């Protein structure tokens, strides 16, 4: 299997700025062990693996250690590579991911991304987290992660 890989610095217009991600274009997904090995070898915060799937692209993200369920900068990097390196002519890319459909549009200012909403529900922190905070939050919400609301920024 031929593997084509790129390194992209997302969220910047200058070399060595932004947030780095590897983008690997594949005709199909190999086993997870190979994906993990490639990500580990890249040794970047994220490696995105992109596979064409009809009108969509399937997308998965790995750190050097684990698979992630969502990664904004590696999604942006993947869209940039598809738009700039593959001859893709449409102005919209639809990615299929474990987090749902992600859309990246080419626009005059660069790219625009649409991600699924992860609405948080009012919640309480686990005691060990709450006890570890020096400043207690006014409100707590939980979706995949916790969101803490404070009266003022400190």
Question: Model-predicted segments: where are they?
Answer:
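Active-site proximal loop and beta-alpha junction motif in alpha/beta enzyme cores
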Residues: 1-70, 76-154
């Amino acid at each position: 299997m031929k593997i084509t890989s790129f390194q992209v610095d997302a969220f910047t217009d200058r070399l060595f700025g932004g947030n780095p991600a590897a983008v690997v274009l594949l005709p199909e997904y190999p086993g997870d062990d190979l994906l993990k090995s490639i990500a580990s070898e890249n040794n970047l915060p994220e490696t995105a693996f992109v596979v064409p799937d009809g009108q969509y692209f399937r997308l998965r993200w790995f750190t050097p250690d684990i698979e992630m369920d969502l990664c904004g900068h590696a999604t942006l990097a993947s869209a940039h590579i598809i738009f700039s390196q593959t001859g893709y002519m449409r102005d919209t890319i639809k990615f299929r991911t474990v987090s749902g459909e992600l859309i990246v549009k080419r626009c005059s200012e660069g790219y625009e991304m649409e991600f699924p909403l992860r609405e948080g529900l009012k919640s309480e922190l686990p005691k060990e987290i709450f006890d570890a905070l020096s400043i207690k939050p006014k409100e707590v919400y939980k979706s995949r992660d916790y969101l803490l609301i404070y009266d003022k920024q400190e």
